[in-house]
């Protein structure tokens, strides 16, 4: 199971919600990582957070990739 590194840019896909989020990894945990959200595309609509304080979690075995 691949793991990102802190400060790497990633893309996190959630097909069930028709959502893809991109952001920078800020913390690694035992089975998941936390990333700062830079952009979210949900159901074809792009959303960019006004501030960079929005964070999300992703399990290592979810659909994600380095960008």
Model-derived features: where do they sit?
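Short coil-to-beta transition motif at edge beta-strands of beta-rich domains
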Residues: 1-16
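Short beta-strand-centered aromatic/proline hotspots
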Residues: 19-28
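Intrinsically disordered, low-complexity, charged/polar segments
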Residues: 39-67
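Residues that cap or initiate secondary-structure elements
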Residues: 16-18, 41
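Short, solvent-exposed secondary-structure boundary/capping segments
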Residues: 31-38
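Generic short amphipathic/hydrophobic targeting helices enriched at N-termini
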Residues: 2, 21-22, 33
């Amino acid at each position: 199971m691949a793991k990102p590194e802190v400060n790497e840019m990633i893309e996190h896909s959630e097909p069930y919600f028709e959502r893809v989020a991109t952001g920078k990894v800020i913390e690694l945990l035992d089975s998941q990582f936390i990333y700062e959200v830079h952009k979210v595309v949900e159901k074809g609509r792009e959303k960019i957070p006004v501030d960079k304080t929005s964070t999300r979690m992703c399990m290592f075995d979810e659909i994600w990739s380095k960008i």
